[in-house]
Amino acid sequence: MKENKKSVSTRRASSHCKASKEKKEDFMMLPTVDFCFKELMQNDNIRKNIIAALLNVPPREVENTELMPTILRKESKDDKYGILDVRVRLKDGEQIDFEMQVEAFDCWANRSVYYLSKMYAGEIKEGEGYDCLKKCIHVSILAYDHFLDDKECY
């Protein structure tokens, strides 16, 4: 049986579509992509296990991980605006800021301290004592070596 050009062409196109579909099904977004990281951290179980690993405690001890707003609001017109990747409050009131950074950023340490200070300062209200302030933790997940000579950062 002799095939005509049209049937060969159709079969090739069909084969190409199948290969293209398989590539799409094999696609996996890396967790270093901001969107993917934020979506993963929406999962309570994943979030608790990451926090447990970072704090070096069993996951069952991480009882509550409330996601908080990530926008660091401006107090005045001239203030710097900030947006955290993922902000979590633990049961005891401590906060953790998770930041994913793929591209090297010269002022990363300064930015991290700025974010932490805004989180910390935002915890105390008028009339409260300073003893009510809770710990704020910053976690930088970097796809590059920021502290080349520092063996403590890993």
Task: Outline where the language-model segments fall.
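Elongated, amphipathic alpha-helical interaction scaffolds
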Residues: M1-Y154
